[in-house]
Amino acid sequence: MNPKTSSPMVSIFLILGGAVFLVFGSLHALYTVLDLRNPRRLVPVDPSVAQAMANTALRLSPGDTNMWRAWIGFNFSHSVGVLLVGALAVWAGLRISTLPSAIMPALILIGCVYLVLALRYWFPDPAIGVAIATACFVAAWLRSLI
């Protein structure tokens, strides 16, 4: 990157945005683990729906898994993806002077994709968190251009 990007504000914005992703990814993973023993967070309100999921095969893999196990797997893999984005952003903030210039637009793109998903399919808290994190990535990129 060019010398302009070595501003401490660029690093701070990247680390803050990454921290938001890390917090949400960690909470999502923790809630998924806790739901294995006592389902009450990332589960349907109606317990009969979760029971139906456990008793229903996944059409892509009949007999190999059920919808409940697939749901748990989707939640874990989603957590891993969010954690990796957060870790990448924090790492980028710590290594700002040696980064390729495309890292910030890539983080912004990833943040925007998560924001669209959050607004369309999730609930307000993750959407707000993703919006804040993505705004931090945009601020870092804009600051790097000054």
Map each language-model feature to its residues.
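Alpha-helical transmembrane segments of integral membrane proteins
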Residues: P8-L22, R69-S79, L83, S101-I108, ...
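Core segments of alpha-helical transmembrane spans in multipass integral membrane proteins
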Residues: A19, P44-W91
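Helix-coil boundary and interhelical linker segments in multi-pass alpha-helical membrane proteins
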Residues: N2-I15, W91-A102, L142-I146
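Hydrophobic alpha-helical transmembrane segments of multipass integral membrane proteins
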Residues: A19-A29, F76-V90, I108-L115, T134-W141
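Juxtamembrane loop-transmembrane helix junctions in multi-pass integral membrane proteins
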Residues: N2-I12, R59-I72, T98, P124
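Membrane-helix boundary connector in multi-pass membrane proteins
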Residues: G93-P105, C112-A131, S144-I146
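N-terminal signal-anchor transmembrane alpha helix
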Residues: V10-V45
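Membrane-embedded alpha-helical bundles that constitute the cytochrome b-like, heme-associated redox core
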Residues: R40-P44, P105, G111
